[in-house]
Swiss-Prot record:
Sequence segments annotated as region (8 X repeats starting with a Trp in each unit): 196-240
Organism: Homo sapiens (Human)
SMART domains: HOX (SM00389)
The name this protein goes by in its record: Homeobox protein NANOGP8
Region described as Sufficient for transactivation activity: spans on this chain: 196-240
Region listing for Sufficient for strong transactivation activity, in residue ranges: 241-305
Amino acid sequence: MSVDPACPQSLPCFEESDCKESSPMPVICGPEENYPSLQMSSAEMPHTETVSPLPSSMDLLIQDSPDSSTSPKGKQPTSAENSVAKKEDKVPVKKQKTRTVFSSTQLCVLNDRFQRQKYLSLQQMQELSNILNLSYKQVKTWFQNQRMKSKRWQKNNWPKNSNGVTQKASAPTYPSLYSSYHQGCLVNPTGNLPMWSNQTWNNSTWSNQTQNIQSWSNHSWNTQTWCTQSWNNQAWNSPFYNCGEESLQSCMHFQPNSPASDLEAALEAAGEGLNVIQQTTRYFSTPQTMDLFLNYSMNMQPEDV
C-alpha cells in the first residue's frame, strides 16, 4: 500500500527533468491539464522562428536604400564636371579666332578701292583678293566692316558737320543777295515753300538792294534826261546867237537906205534883244520859254525897222 503512492510522486520528478531539458522556462509540475499549453508554446516557437527572418530582410532593404540614395549623389558631380569640362572646351574655341593683319600696302589698296566703289561683285572681289594675296572671305569681311564703320560715322557726325557748314560757309561762299536763298534751303531741307518764300521775298537786305537798284536806275535816267536837256540847251543856244547875228546883219543891210536916227534905234533894239536872250538862256532851260523869247525877238524886228 505504501509503494503505490510513491510511484506517482516519482513520475512527476522525471517529467520535471524532461521539462527542464526541453525548455529553459520553469514549469510547475501539475496535473495533465498543463500539457496542452506546453504543446501550444512549442507550436508557437517555430512560428516565431519563421517570422524572425523578416526583420532581417527589412534591415537589408534599409541598408540597401542608403546605397541607392547615395548612388545618384555620386553621379551628379560627374555630370556637373562634364558640363564644366565642356564649357572649358568651348571657351578656347572662341579665343582661337584670329584677326587678319593687313599690311600698309594692302590697306592703301583696299581704302582706295572702297572710296571708288563700296560694293564689289563676286568677280571683282576675287580679282582683288588675287592681287593682294588674300582670301575671298577676308576681302568680303573687310568691305562689310568698312561699310558699317562709314555708316556709323555718318550717323554720328553728319548733323554736327551740317550745322557747321550752314553757320560758317554760308556767309563767305555766297554773296549777300543769294545768302537768304542758301540759308533757306539748308534750314528747311524738307521743302516747305512758305518758309522759303518768306525768307527770300521778305528779306530786308534783298528789298534794300532792289530799292538801291531802282534809285540807281532813276539816277541814270535823270542823268540821261539832264544830258539831253543840256544838249538841247546847246542846240537852242546856237540858233539864238545866230538869230542875233542875223538881226545885226539885217540892220547893216538897211544902213544905206535908212537915216541915222533909224539906224541907231534899230541897233539899240537889236542890242536889247541880244541882252534879253542871253539872260534868259542863263536862267531858263525849258523849250517853251525859248520859243517865247524867239517869237518876241522876231516880232520886234519889223516894228523897229
